[in-house]
Amino acid sequence: MRVIIQRVKGSSVRVNGEIVGQISRGLNLLVGIGNNDTESELDWMTRKCLELRLFPAEEGGDRWEKSVQEIQGELLVISQFTLYGDCRKGRRPSFSDSASPSIAKTLYDQFVAQLKDSGLKVETGIFGAMMQVTIDNDGPVTLLLER
């Protein structure tokens, strides 16, 4: 499982020109599910996303001392199978390391449900849809989590 985690001042996702998910201050999570991933990765990834200290204790501060939970931030979760694109050969990425859509959707939905259990506002895109994502990256702070 791979998650690109981005600290944002705001983020939104559109499908067919319509906003389907939108947040203010918090985290944008681009989520890729690999073909070897199981439910065992979900708890660790959920904890990391919710507990990583990526926010300053005070506005304008430079030390990251608070998590998204501690600031009562918001989460925008977007499915992103292309995180498993392999570009080592040829000119076209191979996605053979990505989980099948049915398995990926099940694990993605479980991940979103675990994040929602935190009580934070959680918005999502539409799994498998072509989406336009607008990200107001704060910092910029962008990290890759992999399990």
UniProtKB/Swiss-Prot annotation:
List the SUPFAM superfamilies hit by this protein, alphabetically: DTD-like (SSF69500)
Main site of residence? cytoplasm
Question: What Gene Ontology cellular-component terms does the record carry?
Answer: cytoplasm
Which taxonomic lineage does the organism of this UniProt entry have?
Bacteria, Bacillati, Cyanobacteriota, Cyanophyceae, Oscillatoriophycideae
Species of origin: Rippkaea orientalis (strain PCC 8801 / RF-1) (Cyanothece sp. (strain PCC 8801))
Listed as disulfide-bonded, the cysteine pairs are none
The encoding gene is dtd
The record ties this protein, via Gene3D superfamilies, to:
D-tyrosyl-tRNA(Tyr) deacylase
**Localization annotation:** Cytoplasm
Protein name, please? D-aminoacyl-tRNA deacylase
According to its UniProt entry, one GO biological process term is: D-amino acid catabolic process
Catalysis performed (reactions) = glycyl-tRNA(Ala) + H2O = tRNA(Ala) + glycine + H(+); a D-aminoacyl-tRNA + H2O = a tRNA + a D-alpha-amino acid + H(+)
